[in-house]
Amino acid sequence: MSNKIAAIVLAAGKGTRMKSDLHKVLHPIAARPMLLHLMASVDELSPAKKVVVVGDKADQLEAALGGTAELAVQDPQLGTGHAVQQAEGALAGFDGDVLILYGDVPFVPAATMRAMLDRLGAADAPAVVVLAFEPADPLQYGRVITEGDRVVKMVEHKDATDAERAVRLCNSGLMAAKAHDLFALLARVTDDNAAKEFYLVDIVNIANADGRSCAVVKTDPDDVAGINSRAELAAAEAQWQAFKREEAMAGGASLRAPETVWFSWDTELGRDVTIEPNVFFGPGVKVADGVNIRANCHIEGATIGTGCEVGPFARLRPGTILGEKAKIGNFVETKKAVLGKGVKASHLTYLGDVTVGADTNFGAGTITCNYDGYFKYETEIGERAFIGSNSALVAPIRIGADAIVAAGSTVTRDVADGELRLVRGEQLVKPGWADRFHDAMRKKKAAEKK
């Protein structure tokens, strides 16, 4: 395979079937735009050039790519062949191998791309390599007519003979060619068809007419699944999630009800992790070995240390870091919370913008009050502190090591190491008051009924 590789990614379609203000190829799969799934696979090849052909909503694509690829604009949009031609300027002087990919076909593995490039560099020097597949239902696809692994003809379903329609090998649209061959062939493509468009597939028939060979590489249908509608987007998400679940279990995680666990593209799981039903991982989650995540948790942007227990019904928000063997229980929410080894918040607690030392315990109903309507403030809690139930810690504040905050306290000033802080109104005891109150109210109610 040549060391000089370029990738042209076609993303100029309007995506009208998505019915969205967001560009079609930026709709997320596993919390990542589908285009970036494809670009990650492309990057595994270390290409010298990456060109994304854009049309509608080009500003969205430019922002999403963040300068990692050159943009070429197709305006007007006159077919796939015309789209590829728009990348010629960006590839001026490039004399290596070119992959032609589609932004709405996001799951093409790098290994498949390598196979196409390897075939392009074979001794028989094909002019074009076509990526083909055999779908369950070939009705909507153009056919690839072959002799061995040579492509002798490409034909759309509507134009195919009965014999050609019986062929199950279909065109994915993805191709590879030498840069000089690609643009020379494209220059000869015409719009002599009903749609008055320049079709990329015509370069195969032109090359064959010149006596040049064209080759085929076959792949799995799932690798070239296209996404043009919300239903196809949902199917792609399901496909990706099924793959990730299998990968997680093969890597040593136990999923009690795999079909109910949802991962993001970058979720990392250690060994001997147990995940109960209905757990959702947003982006940026790292889970160490031996963690138990109980049912109905939502976790994003969090790092969970070895041996931790999370949930059920817990929410870990971005910036959460749990030390070894920490416990976050039911109806606990954390955000920008760094919790040391063995910290326990077992129920009904909010911990935001807080750093907590090892072995500190939070009683039910504890809240770090971190926002005054304008700014966020931080809470610092030392090791082995005990925060009693129904306590409000008003930031900015520091609670010292080994300190105790008594239940029901609203703490607004720092608590020293080893100190007890009790902020609670004196209990008022009035014997018989409740009996007299009930008696008076019953009499009043009876009088109103007369």
Residue ranges and their predicted role:
Residues M1-A6, R32-D118, A123, R442-K443:
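Conserved N-terminal catalytic core of the sugar/cofactor nucleotidyltransferase
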